[in-house]
Amino acid sequence: MDLEESRPKGVFECELCRLSVPYTYFGQRPPNSHSVVLLEQCFITKDPFTPDKEKFLILGSPCSLCEKAVCVGTECSLFYSKRFCLPCVLQHRDDFPPEIQQEVDKRKAQKKS
């Protein structure tokens, strides 16, 4: 990322956990990562832990059902061909395959522990 590309475009805020981080790009083709095309529109920032311009972190994306901005944390969202916030996953649980339902049940059990 050049100087212009590394400047924050705004602040990403997860509508569930309130994680708040400046982002430098929103979309599917991160700058300087010419061979990478993401499966969803994502809020992205340059990876602060490496000088490599091609490295980036995905902060989150809009839920494909309700459009809430959610982070990629397991407490907030799940990716199954698209990003879904956990409240939508729970609300539409039966619409997901058994493997995803089991994953959701595991997360709920871990949350209670």
UniProtKB/Swiss-Prot annotation:
One Pfam family recorded for the sequence: C6_DPF
InterPro entries for this protein: CDPF1, CDPF1_dom
Origin superkingdom: Eukaryota
PANTHER family the record matches: CYSTEINE-RICH DPF MOTIF DOMAIN-CONTAINING PROTEIN 1 (PTHR31849:SF1), CYSTEINE-RICH PDF MOTIF DOMAIN-CONTAINING PROTEIN 1 (PTHR31849)
Family: Belongs to the CDPF1 family.
The protein's name in its UniProt record: Cysteine-rich DPF motif domain-containing protein 1
Provenance organism: Xenopus laevis (African clawed frog)
Protein encoded by which gene: cdpf1
